[in-house]
Amino acid sequence: MSSCGACTCGAAAARLLTTSLTSAQRGISCGRIHVPVLGRLGTLDTQILRRAPLRTFSETPAYFASKDGTNKDGSGDGNKKSVTEGSSKKSGSGNSGKGGNQLRCPKCGDLCTHVETFVSSTRFVKCEKCHHFFVVLSEADSKKSIIKEPESAAEAVKLAFQQKPPPPPKKIYNYLDKYVVGQSFAKKVLSVAVYNHYKRIYNNIPANLRQQAEVEKQTSLTPRELEIRRREDEYRFTKLLQIAGISPHGNALGASMQQQGSQQMPQEKRGGEVLDSPHDDIKLEKSNILLLGPTGSGKTLLAQTLAKCLDVPFAICDCTTLTQAGYVGEDIESVIAKLLQDANYNVEKAQQGIVFLDEVDKIGSVPGIHQLRDVGGEGVQQGLLKLLEGTIVNVPEKNSRKLRGETVQVDTTNILFVASGAFNGLDRIISRRKNEKYLGFGTPSNLGKGRRAAAAADLANRSGESNTHQDIEEKDRLLRHVEARDLIEFGMIPEFVGRLPVVVPLHSLDEKTLVQILTEPRNAVIPQYQALFSMDKCELNVTEDALKAIARLALERKTGARGLRSIMEKLLLEPMFEVPNSDIVCVEVDKEVVEGKKEPGYIRAPSKESSEEDYDSGVEEDGWPRQADAANS
C-alpha cells in the first residue's frame, strides 16, 4: 500500500509539474487541478486543490481602426473595435460613449477596464471575463522601445566612420576669418582644438572594433533586421517580468532594471593582464579651453561661427542661469541636455560633441560669504567639476515626465568643453601680482579680493579720463601674462581652473579692427543696414571718415564691437523713419553726421506730374515708392 501511495503521489507530482511548466510557457495564469492524495488508511481520495488566481499580464500593441472596422494592417476585425491610442487615457468601463474608444480583450473580445493606480495616466487594463491584465501600447511606443536600447560600441565606431574626414586646422581658420575679424591667436587655438577632437574620437576607439567597422564599411553588410527583432523580443520579455514583479537581477519589487545592450563591450585588461602586458594603448585625453577677453571682442561670435562648420553636435550654454542642485534655476545637467537635443537625441553622437560655456566668469565665487551657500557661484563650479573631467550624466529623456523619472545616460569623457568670459578686472589682479602701477597715479594698493572687487575697481578706473589706446594696450599686455592663481583670486576654485588647461586671452579691438568689422566680414554691420534700405528702394552710403568716427565712438564706450550697432541705430533713426514710402533714393552719412554737426543727406527722385489717384501708397512709378503727400515736397 505504501508503494501504491508513493506511486500515486509521484504521478500527481508529475501532473502538477507538467501543468505548471505548460502554464509558465503560456504566461502566468490561474486555474484548478485535481490532485489525488491519500486519505484514510487503505483508501484513495481525490480532492480539488484551489489556487488563488494569479494575475496574467500580456503586452499588446494598439492598432488604429477605421470606421469600417478595418485595421491599419489591412485585416478586418468584424464588429470588434481596435484599441486606439487616445483610449489609454480614458475610462473604458461600460458600453457608453463611442465604440472606437473602448478597449477590447485580444483573447475573448470582451470589454476591458482600466486599473486604478496612483498614476492618473495608467496603461494597465483588465478583462472582466477572462481576468487577464494587459499593457496598452501604441505603435509609436513599440518603435520607441527599440530605439531606447543602448547602442553598442560598434555603433559608435560606425558613427565615427560615417562622418566626413575632419577638416584641417588651416581650413577651419580660413572659414573663421570670413566672419570674425582679428583674434588670430584664438582662431588658431580653436581650429587646432577641433581638429584634435576629431582625432581623439577616432583614436580612443578599440582597435578590434575599428577593424570590424572598416571591414563592415568595405563589404557593406546586410541591414540589422534580425538584431532589431532580437532586441524587441528581449525588451518585451524583461518588461513583462517587471510588470509581474519579477526582476532579472533578483529584486522582488522589480523597480529599476537597466536595459542590457545587445553586444558586450570589450573587456579591458585588468589585474595580472596589465602587469604582464608589454605595452598599453595610448588613450588621448581632452584639453578643455578657457577664452578670456573684454566684452565685445568676439568670443561668442567665434563659437557661433564654429558651430556652423562642424559635423559634431555643438551646444552653446549660458552659465548665468545655472544653479546648484536643489535650487530654483537650470540644473547643471541641462548643459548636456542641450547637446543631446542638438544631436537629435542620439546618445552616441552627443558623446562626441563640443559644449561652449558662455559667461563662465559670472559663476565666480564671492569671498567673505563662506558661511552662506553660494548656489549660483561656487556651487555651480563644484557641480561642473566631474562634468568637465568625464562622468556619466543622467539627462531627462525627451518628453518624459518627472513622475516616471526616465533618464538617458550620457558619458562626458569625450566631450570637449570651451569656456569663455569677460573677467572684468582680471588685468588689475595681474598688475597687483606683478607689483606694477596701473596707468599712472591713484592706483589703490589695498584692493579687495574676488570678482566683485576687481569689477568695481575696473569700473572706477573707467569713470576717470584716460587715454583709450594706452588703456587697451596695457590691458592686452597684462592679460597675456595671466596665470592660474590670478583666476583663483578672481573667484574661480582651483579644481575648476585645473580642468581648463588651455587659457587663451583675446585682445581688445582697436580703431582699425572696428572699421574692418563694419564692412569686411560676411554679415557685417554696414551691409545689413544697406539691405534694410534696399527693401525700400533706397541706397545707403557711408564715407571712410564716417566709419573711422564710428569706430572712435565705439572705443570710447568700451563695449567692443557691440557698440557699433548701438551707434548705427542712433545715426540712422531719422533716415529709417523718413525713407519708407517716400521719394528718397539715397541716404549719405559722413563724418559731420556722426559727430552730430548736421543731419544725414537725402537724394530724392525727380518728381513727375501725376493725378491724385497715382499717389496711393500701393502705386509705384519708375520703380520708386511714392507717398500720398509727396507733392508737398
Swiss-Prot record:
The EC number(s) this enzyme carries: 3.6.4.10
Main function: ATP-dependent chaperone that functions as an unfoldase. As part of the ClpXP protease complex, it recognizes specific protein substrates, unfolds them using energy derived from ATP hydrolysis, and then translocates them to the proteolytic subunit (CLPP) of the ClpXP complex for degradation. Thanks to its chaperone activity, it also functions in the incorporation of the pyridoxal phosphate cofactor into 5-aminolevulinate synthase, thereby activating 5-aminolevulinate (ALA) synthesis, the first step in heme biosynthesis.
Chain ranges of the ClpX-type ZB domain: 93-146
Family label: Belongs to the ClpX chaperone family.
Primary localization: mitochondrion
Composition bias type Acidic residues, residue spans: 611-622
Gene3D superfamilies: 1.10.8.60, P-loop containing nucleotide triphosphate hydrolases
Organelle targeting peptide span: 1-56
Protein name: ATP-dependent clpX-like chaperone, mitochondrial
Encoding gene per record: Clpx
The UniProt record lists the keyword ATP-binding: yes
Native species: Rattus norvegicus (Rat)
Biological process annotations from GO: ATP metabolic process; proteolysis; proteolysis involved in protein catabolic process
